[in-house]
Amino acid sequence: MKIKIEYRKLGREQAHGIAESDGIVIIDSRLKGKKHLEILLHECLHILNPMDDENAIIDKSVTLCKILWKEGYRRVDNSNDTPLQDGSK
């Protein structure tokens, strides 16, 4: 499944992020750091698990965010050299 990430200010929508049914995730461009990671995970989980209720999505996104943040994940390196498990980059 392909998910496209877009960034724009979402003040009018009163949301940090939006997941659209066509696989587009919109993230508020003002988010930084750990909150950015949490919302990115949250909106992607909505697309990957459309039957989950909001509380399940929140639980999963917060758990994943805490694990990744503790492991040192930060949005710094944009290199694409090593393929993922499915062979894609």
State what each model feature region is:
Residues M1-K35, P50-K89:
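Metalloprotease/metallohydrolase-associated module, dominated by Zn2+-dependent proteases
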Residues E38-I47:
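Active-site recognition of the HExxH zinc-binding catalytic motif
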